Amino acid sequence: MLRALKGHVESPLIVVTRAASTNAEKLEEIRERLAKGPNFQDFVQNPDYSKSEWENYEGKLRREKGEEQRLRLPPWLKTTIPMGKNYAKIKNQLRELKLSTVCEEARCPNIGECWGGGEHGTQTATIMLMGDTCTRGCRFCSVKTARKPPPLDENEPVNTATAIASWGLDYIVLTSVDRDDLPDGGSKHIAKTVKEIKARNSNIFVECLVPDFRGDLGCVETIANCGLDVYAHNIETVEKLTPYVRDRRAHYRQTLKVLSEAKRFNPNLITKSSIMLGLGETDEEVENTLKDLREAGVDCITLGQYMQPTNKHLKVIEYVTPEKFKHWEDRGNQLGFLYTASGPLVRSSYKAGEFFITSILENRKKRQALNSKPEQ
């Protein structure tokens, strides 16, 4: 899903979605809403489509077996062209710093909202660690692959933490390529980055979207106990489709095991996963996947539309309607997820989700502080 530009090996691969509001009153309003415990949907309402616009859509939404022709993009997946002062500022800063942005290369549908500021002016960033080359080749992902990618940059943890500290962010997401060529899968490198970030700013919330480390529980424990706040690992699709969608080394049950063990190693963690829809899955299979994730103790789930990155990747089987995504949002809430983000343009590191999780973590800290106070 992510890929970086060539030629900047020494720099961390950074996707900045810094959208700082210039309106003090607006920021104060957001803080007040967080303090009162907002609903996640307060942050993810998409004004670009309404039921009246998609309900009467007569275009084809599903490819039949054997059909080669690609489906046309329905109206609810069409987004506005990125623009605005914040967008231009972010883009220029990245160029000046010679930092690579996977937002652009992956053609993320939310780039205009994130870089342009969005409705709430949230300040988040996503950083991709350990290079731009993955040892795996999932059929939905456009990251380049190799059996033995270049060695890790040993300065990356410090450089990344220093950059983050200077930005004054509230929430950071660390993601990475798979590095099966390394004995520990890069787990110590990721853990060191988290520790360096926390050493500079203990108040920043850190989410790690990590690989499965081949199911090595020692690596999972390293990440779970490194000081992060959110442990994320994506299941991607339903069990039946996993061998066709993900790399052969990725296993459905292994993903569930990683998520459940992360919670066992550190019960205070928030755990998170993501499902792509539109690959040919049935409603029953999605339902079972949601139940499996809840049984594994997963707290947060995101569901979004699969989008074919290039002609070489898996074709979209179906464009799922906003109504169906709303159904899965309701179902996730019924099953007891801490939050369910479900929508055509929702992605696993959707910034509004980060904003909402921040409020959850802040409330947890407040409760822990109150509970730790000695009785008078």
From Swiss-Prot:
This is Lipoyl synthase, mitochondrial. It comes from the Eukaryota. Pathway: Protein modification; protein lipoylation via endogenous pathway; protein N(6)-(lipoyl)lysine from octanoyl-[acyl-carrier-protein]: step 2/2. Gene3D superfamilies: Aldolase class I (3.20.20.70). Pfam families: LIAS_N, Radical_SAM. It catalyses: [[Fe-S] cluster scaffold protein carrying a second [4Fe-4S](2+) cluster] + N(6)-octanoyl-L-lysyl-[protein] + 2 oxidized [2Fe-2S]-[ferredoxin] + 2 S-adenosyl-L-methionine + 4 H(+) = [[Fe-S] cluster scaffold protein] + N(6)-[(R)-dihydrolipoyl]-L-lysyl-[protein] + 4 Fe(3+) + 2 hydrogen sulfide + 2 5'-deoxyadenosine + 2 L-methionine + 2 reduced [2Fe-2S]-[ferredoxin]. It is found in: Mitochondrion. CDD domains: Radical_SAM. PROSITE patterns: RADICAL_SAM (PS51918). Binds 2 [4Fe-4S] clusters per subunit. One cluster is coordinated with 3 cysteines and an exchangeable S-adenosyl-L-methionine. [4Fe-4S] cluster 1 binds at C103, C108, C114, S349. [4Fe-4S] cluster 2 binds at C134, C138, C141. This protein may be expected to contain an N-terminal transit peptide but none has been predicted. Belongs to the radical SAM superfamily. Lipoyl synthase family. HAMAP family: Lipoyl_synth (MF_00206). Residues 119-338 form the Radical SAM core domain. Keywords: 4Fe-4S, Iron, Iron-sulfur, Metal-binding, Mitochondrion, S-adenosyl-L-methionine, Transferase. Its main location: mitochondrion. GO terms for cellular component: mitochondrion. It comes from Drosophila ananassae (Fruit fly). Its EC number is 2.8.1.8. One of its GO terms (molecular function) is 4 iron, 4 sulfur cluster binding. Its cofactor is [4Fe-4S] cluster.
